[in-house]
Structures are given as C-alpha cells and as structure tokens.
C-alpha cells in the first residue's frame, strides 16, 4: 500500500498538495502490483500542468472502453467500436477485409482479394490483385488487372488469363482464354480477344486483335484495323488487316490494305494486298490496288502505282506505273502501263512504256509501246513501238516501228520501220520495208531492200 500523507499540518483545505506531502508517488503509478497503489478520486479531478507517462509502462490489454474528449475539454468514456466512423471515412472494405471501395459516393462491387476501386461509379472488380482508378461501368474480372478510367471498359475472365491493362477510353474489351500481358491504351470499341499473349492496342476506334495462336500483336491507332497473325503490326490507317496463316505481317498506314504470310510489309496506300501460302518478306510501299499473290511468292516488291500485280513470283519487282504484271522470278518492271513479264521471262526487265511484253528469260525491253520479246533465247528491244523478237533469239532491236526479228541467232535491227530480219547473224541498220533472209547479211538503210 502507498504510505500515508506526511506533513499533514501543512495541508490546508483549498490548497495544493505538494509532491513532498506524499511518499512513493512514483511507485504508485509504476509498480507491477497496481492494486496496492489504487488512487480513487470522488468529484472532479483537474490537472493544470502537463501529465507525462512512460510509454513502456502502459498496460497493453484489450478493453471495451476508451477515454475521449470534445471541444469543451470534458473527458468521456466511450466504446472502442464507436471509433469506426463509417460515415466520414472516404474508403471502406468491399466484400471482405482484403479489398477497398469508395465509401462516400458511387455504387461499387469489389469481390477480389487485395483489389482496389479508387473512384468513379458502378465499377466492378472480381479478380484478385486488381485496380480500377476511376470512370463508370468498368469491370476487371481477371487477376492482376488494371483499368485507369473511362466508360464501360472490360477485362473479362478467361482460363489462365491475367495481367492485363486498359488505361482509359470507352467500350474497350480484353477477353478470352490464355490472354496475358495485354494492353489497350484508349480509344473506343477496341478489342483484344482469343489471343495467347502480349497483344497491344494503343488507341483508335473499333480495332481488333484476335486469333487462337501466337502473340506479340500490335495496333497503334486508326479505325477498324485487324491483326490476327502472330507478331503482326498495324501502325494506323483504317480497315487494314494483317491476317493469320503466317507471322510478322506489317501494315504502316493507309486504307483497306491486307497481308497474309510470313513477314509481309505494306507501308501505306489503299487496297494493297500481299497474300499466299508461302509469302515471305514481300513488300508493297504504297499506291492503290497493288497485289502480290500466289502459292509461292518470296521477297517480291511493288513500290507504288495502280493495280500492279506480282502473281506467284519470287524476287520480282515493280517500281510503279499502272496495270503492270511481273509473273516470273527475278523479273523487273520499272513503270509505265500494262507492261508484263510473263512466267517464262525469268530474270527479264521492262523499264517502262506501254503494253510491252517480255516472255523470254534474261530479256530486256527499255520502253516504247507494244514491243514483244517472245524468242527462245535472251534478246533486247530498246524502244520504239510494235517491235517483235521471236524465233531463236540472242537478237537486238534498237527502236523504230513494226520491226521484226524471227530468224535464227544473232540478228539485229537498229531502227526504221517495217523491217524484217529472218536470217542468221544478219544486220539491218534502218530504213523501211527491208528484209533479210540469208546468213551473215547486212542492209544499212534504204527502202524495200532484200538480202
């Protein structure tokens, strides 16, 4: 028990009790056996100075009551349960103690463990370790998902799907089984569905990434673009499609362009198409309605122009022009209109002009109109119009009009009009209506000469 008061004669009614009037005052507040030092006060107890208690000496025991004060300075006994002020708290738990939803506004549904809805209205989480920052009508149903904000965005549940992100926008959707590491930045009505892994749409409207195989697909922006080939990319534009059946297709921009096969590239333009079972590393830079197609068509190239075609040819090139066709491997058309290298014209070239045809391997037409190399061996027409090399070949027409070589090897017509060389190792320089039918013959010029 505490000792009795000392110096009682010094204690007077209404006066302060000094520290030396009481012995063992420290023990009374710090001893282990507190019952021996109980202090009872009837009436009011007023402290005008500071009160200090050593924190380590406080008893740590659960009690149903605490002391509290209000702005009048009075002390009250309160239930500990009254400290949970649900009305004034900004956040509260959702379906259990392991998730958080706003308390003072909105309607929310959070059933995910360790998940948080920070703001907005009518947002819903039923995936674990997920987060919705703001917006309305957003839903995150897979684990480790993130929706930053926006309206009616959805990350829906699927077998073994997790770790997906929608930053914002409206009506964007991530769905399907095995859909991991997917991303939609913003925009409207963009979808990533039924892909395995690693799909991303940065923005735009009504863009779609889909396919039941592969991953690594990307759409930058634009409208109504589609990627369903592994590692396929559409940077922008509208109505572009990187189709399945291959991998690594690329469309830069433009409208209604399409690719099918391994690593095809369409940089831009409109209605350009690369398609075929074994297309690899073919490219169309621009233009309109240009096509590279066929069962086998590798490393072919169209630079631009209108309605140019490379059907089933490897390493073929059309630089530009209109309605040109390169059907042979390693063939070349520089430009012009309606020029063609047929399927038998391997390693042949038409530089320009109109309606020129190279059907012989390793042949060359520089330009002009309606010139034809249809010989059995490589030959050359430099230009002119309506000139023809047929027969054995290894022949040359420099230019002119309606000149024809149809004989054996090594024949030459430099120019002129309506000249014919059906000989062997023979030469016509120029003139009109000249004809050679012999061996090792020459007509330098003139009209209606015969050799």
Locate each region found by the language model.
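Periodic small-residue-enriched repeat registers in elongated scaffold domains
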Residues: 83-451
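Extracellular "spike/adhesin" assembly and maturation modules
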Residues: 1-80
């Amino acid at each position: 028990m505490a000792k009795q008061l000392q110096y009682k004669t010094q204690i007077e009614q209404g006066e302060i009790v000094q520290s030396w009037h009481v012995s063992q005052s420290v023990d009374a507040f710090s001893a282990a056996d507190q019952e021996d030092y109980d202090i009872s006060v009837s009436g009011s107890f007023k402290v005008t100075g500071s009160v200090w208690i050593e924190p380590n000496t406080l008893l740590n025991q659960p009690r149903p009551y605490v002391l509290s004060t209000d702005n009048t300075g009075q002390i009250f006994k309160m239930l500990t349960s009254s400290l949970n002020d649900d009305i004034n708290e900004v956040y509260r738990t959702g379906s259990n103690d392991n998730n958080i939803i706003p308390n003072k506004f909105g309607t929310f549904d959070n059933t995910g463990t360790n998940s948080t809805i920070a703001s907005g209205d009518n947002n819903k989480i039923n995936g674990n370790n997920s987060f919705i920052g703001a917006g309305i009508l957003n839903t995150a149903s897979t684990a480790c998902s993130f929706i930053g904000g926006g309206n009616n965005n959805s990350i829906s549940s699927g077998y073994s799907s997790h770790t997906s992100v929608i930053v914002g926008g409206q009506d964007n959707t991530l769905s399907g089984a095995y859909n991991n590491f997917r991303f939609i930045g913003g925009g409207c009505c963009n979808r990533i569905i039924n892909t395995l892994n690693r799909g991303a749409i940065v923005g735009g409207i009504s863009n779609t990434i889909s396919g039941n195989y592969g991953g690594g697909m990307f759409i930058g922006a634009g409208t109504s673009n589609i990627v369903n080939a592994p590692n396929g990319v559409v940077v922008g534009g509208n109505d572009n499609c990187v189709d399945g059946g291959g991998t690594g297709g690329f469309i830069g921009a433009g409208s209604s362009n399409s690719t099918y096969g391994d690593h095809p590239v369409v940089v831009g333009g409109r209605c350009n198409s690369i398609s075929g079972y074994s297309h690899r590393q073919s490219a169309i830079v621009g233009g309109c309605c240009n096509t590279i197609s066929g069962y086998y068509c590798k490393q072919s190239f169209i630079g631009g122009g209108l309605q140019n075609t490379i059907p089933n040819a490897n390493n073929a090139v059309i630089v530009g022009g209109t309605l040109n066709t390169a059907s042979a491997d390693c063939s070349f058309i520089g430009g012009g209109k309606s020029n063609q290298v047929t399927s038998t014209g391997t390693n042949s070239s038409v530089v320009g002009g109109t309606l020129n045809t190279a059907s012989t391997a390793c042949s060359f037409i520089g330009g002009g109109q309606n010139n034809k190399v249809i010989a059995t061996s490589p030959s050359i027409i430099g230009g002119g119009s309506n000139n023809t090399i047929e027969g054995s070949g290894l022949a040359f027409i420099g230019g002119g009009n309606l000149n024809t070589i149809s004989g054996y090897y090594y024949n030459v017509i430099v120019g002129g009009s309506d000249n014919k060389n059906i000989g062997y190792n023979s030469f016509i320089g120029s003139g009109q209506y000249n004809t050679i039918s012999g061996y090792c013959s020459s007509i330098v010029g003139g009209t209606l000469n015969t050799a």
